[in-house]
Amino acid sequence: MPTLTPGRVRHGVVFTLKHPEGSPEEADFLKANSELASIPGVEAFEIMREVSPKNPYRFSLVMEFVDRAAYDAYSAHPDHVSFVRDLVVPAVTDFLELDSEAL
């Protein structure tokens, strides 16, 4: 991702799933995450596998928004709310969310 310009927001989540590594359930969950990119306001989207042994997480998801208002609208969007409720809560064992604004 390019350098964040002032005012833009980068939303990141690192997480670990309940599903066994390499399982069909893991693959389905990761594929479903791409649906978040279609929610209005999402301007950049990446989902990645964590490679550092320095943290306990297995995956990361990063997206960018033009500003806080766009991020807030995304967070409250019904598709995001239902995604978290129906897919994230049952499947994720641990996570850390980082929401950052460029200086």
What is the predicted role of each segment?
Residues 1-59, 66-76, 99-103:
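Short S/T/G/P-rich N-terminal loop/turn motif that feeds into the first structured element of a domain
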Residues 68-96:
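C-terminal structural segments of small proteins and small subunits
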